[in-house]
């Protein structure tokens, strides 16, 4: 395992990381291309002595794609009051609830834990928990990620794990995370909802994400300033151009630029062209283009034998965070898989210590 920090000794650390990891990762080009210029052709003159001056043609303001970060920042995420639907069996030192809240008028369900004991004067710190891809037709709120939620909840946090739209009993369509902002919208409304909850401290909110949930976490942290720190395990955290060309699954797989007609890649490329043809668009929908404005420090974890999400994604984000002069920690787990199963205990300890440092105690 390697532990990589950014801080005052960053130049020495970068040298160490490069030698430890092999070839230096390629940083995605986030420089937008200059917009095309437009020159109006003159109209022919009338045969009379009067010269006709053409009226200016109004230029339509392009409608931003819903995935664009500037479009997401312009939206409102009011959330709602939290409704306790079912009281579940408690944990060792925390209560468990099956709750609901509203997101774009949809009733979204979630699992929420609340510590037992006397509440701090400002309320309990919160961790918004973003799960990875689970087929919506088999998703169950109280299954999967049980040990993850338990360890964070035992450490004195409200844990709020949203069932994104179309998952479990949540209303709406499960349209995926990468072609629509829907799941991120549901999470941002979860943030707003938990801020209303009387036992929660609205100024001490962190976010945890695994795989697809890491994508949602990174996007959330460049859209809102409410998230004080983020922890991402095996995250889909590359820029969109890198998602197109570097996301390969399974041993021996190779990058492809020919996505299937049913994929989000094909749909976006058909409408907006490739990243080479339209870099401005692809950068505008990538959270990586906005790391200079991220809401807090980030901790990354990734197994070196992950066959679902490339280790390279976390490596790229690490260097991009450094370039943006943002605080980041990066842990690699030798020989471990997508769920970091072999080093789970150590990774969770580091996760909780990070949240304690930057969320619970606000250092």
Named regions from a protein language model:
Residues 294, 300-302, 306:
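Short beta-strand/loop motif that positions the catalytic acidic residue
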Residues 76-122:
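N-terminal cap/lid segment of alpha/beta-hydrolase-fold proteins
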Residues 315-363:
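C-terminal catalytic histidine-bearing segment of alpha/beta-hydrolase fold enzymes
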Residues 21-67, 251-260:
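Ser/Thr-rich, Proline-interspersed low-complexity disordered segments
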Residues 214-225:
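Short glycine-enriched nucleophile-adjacent loop
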Residues 139, 241-290, 296:
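Mobile cap/lid helix-loop segments that gate and shape the active-site cleft of serine hydrolases
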